[in-house]
Swiss-Prot record:
The gene is tilS. This is tRNA(Ile)-lysidine synthase. It is found in: Cytoplasm. It comes from Yersinia pseudotuberculosis serotype I (strain IP32953). Its EC number is 6.3.4.19. It catalyses: cytidine(34) in tRNA(Ile2) + L-lysine + ATP = lysidine(34) in tRNA(Ile2) + AMP + diphosphate + H(+). GO terms for molecular function: ATP binding; tRNA(Ile)-lysidine synthase activity. Its main location: cytoplasm.
């Protein structure tokens, strides 16, 4: 069959156009109707128009259906027939937080991201009916224009892009194509379970709407497109405002937000959270973020969870924190100092120390870092966490309480317990990357050690 001039061209031409210059694709392949049609179209494209097209398929084994193993076998046979490399990935689903559907989707896209090669783009097979369902589900949740934008035909994904080339076509069109090409596909019996919201819409709601209004799905897609346009316009209009309100550490100025209207402030907050990879907050979460975190009394240490991220406030700025690994020990022995074999007055430097809770590595280096006095031969070096008592630091004439020291140096509360403290014996020598105590001060014109903390990009 010559697909360039035949009826299936209605599906093939948009796919050809959307691929552009991309010649390496990874296809999400469940074995169902939609992804089978997409994979077949790509095979035809490779045969007739783009012989250099490199196609890989990925099948996600969710382990939720008794037939899952037989689906893997079907996908392997199909890919073998079409000479396509197939990757099968087994995932574990944890439905406790957002339910099975959301958990499966999250696991699926994590697997896609982990297996997407350097030059590849990801292709998935959502169609017009899926778009309509997504719009209605967002409407049910009370979403704004961002949520009602539903699914984009093209969007950034991992280090590359995600393309949905079938988004403008109904399931009926795909089914007609599959039957005409005598394709075989899997029918997932769980799709008939209307306890799931998406199935409920597909089985019980959309047939009635489409019977009454045959072009309901197309109209819904147009509305989703208009919402997406409005969001894109807001992104462009607010980009400069967001940049002006952000500090070098990507914290957000509360004083700057106070100058904005309520609507503009909410829009900026949403974009700030999205730019840092947080899930879209609900209206209630956004109100709590402002009232309970940003507007909390000055001596409070407010916090709010959004997904797995934590919003905190410090010095009139908002911070979005990644989940922080727990520090399970407050004391880490490092080394007992030994004399150098050449009888040098400078003892041997200890080997680098790997810190717990993803805090990086401490080491002594030949130059740079923090200059501290050398440890004496036989002196025990350790690292501890949790500054306590009165501290005398270099550059201050008087001792200060530990809390005052952190405040004066501008260290946010959530970082204070995660900063390694260097001890020689029972003497505090330095807080890595922050200060050196008078007890740890290197004497001028005398040899010294240089403490370097190779820490992760974000301490919190």
């Amino acid at each position: 069959m010559n697909l360039v001039t035949s009826k299936p061209n209605v599906l093939l031409n948009p796919l050809f156009a959307q691929l552009g210059e991309n010649r390496h694709v990874l296809v999400g392949f469940s074995g169902g109707l939609d992804s089978t049609v997409l994979l077949h179209l790509l095979v035809c494209l490779r045969q007739q128009l783009i012989p250099e097209l490199n196609i890989r398929a990925i099948h996600i084994h969710h382990g939720l259906n008794p037939q899952a193993d037989s689906w893997v076998k079907h996908c392997m046979q199909q890919c073998d027939q079409w000479k396509i490399e197939l990757k099968v990935v087994r995932v574990n689903i944890d439905p406790r937080q957002n339910g099975i559907e959301a958990a499966a989707r999250t696991a699926r896209y994590q697997a896609f991201s982990a297996n997407l090669a350097a030059k590849e783009v990801l292709l998935t097979a959502q169609h017009l009916d899926d778009q309509c369902e997504t719009f209605l589900l967002a409407l049910k949740r009370g979403s704004g224009p961002a949520g009602l934008s539903a699914m984009a035909a093209k969007m950034p994904f991992a280090h590359s892009q995600l393309l949905r080339p079938l988004l403008a076509f109904s399931r009926e069109i795909l089914e007609n194509y599959a039957q005409a090409q005598q394709l075989q596909w899997i029918e997932d019996d769980s799709n008939q379970d209307d306890r799931f919201d998406r199935n409920f819409l597909r089985l019980n709601v959309l047939p009635i709407l489409n019977q009454r209004w045959p072009h309901f799905a197309q109209a819904t897609a147009r509305s989703a497109g208009l919402c997406a346009e409005q969001e894109q316009l807001l992104d462009e209009l607010l980009a400069e405002n967001l940049q002006q309100l952000q500090g070098p550490d990507r914290s957000l100025s509360i004083d700057g937000l106070l100058q904005a209207s309520m609507a503009k402030r909410a829009a900026i907050l949403r974009r700030w959270l999205a730019s840092l990879g947080a899930p879209m907050p609900s209206q209630s979460q956004l109100q709590r973020l402002w009232l309970e975190v940003a507007m909390a009394r000055q001596d409070a240490e407010p916090q709010l969870m959004i997904g797995t991220r934590q919003v905190r406030r410090f010095r009139q700025h908002l911070y979005l924190l990644m989940p922080l690994a727990e520090i399970t020990t407050n004391y880490l022995p490092w080394a007992t100092v030994k004399a150098a074999p050449n009888s040098s007055i400078i003892p041997l430097l200890p080997e680098p120390l790997w810190l717990p809770a993803d805090l990086g590595v401490l080491r002594f280096v030949s130059a740079g870092g923090q200059a501290v006095r050398p440890a004496a031969v036989g002196e025990e070096i350790s690292v501890r966490f949790g500054l306590q008592g009165d501290i005398k630091i270099v550059g201050r004439h008087h001792s200060r309480q530990s809390k005052k020291v952190w405040q004066e140096l501008g260290i946010p509360p959530w970082q204070r317990e995660r900063i390694p403290l260097l001890y020689f014996g029972e003497q505090l020598i330095a807080a890595a990357g922050v200060f050196v105590t008078q007890a740890g001060q290197a004497n001028e014109n005398e040899p010294c050690w240089h403490l370097d903390w190779d820490k992760p990009l974000k301490l919190g």
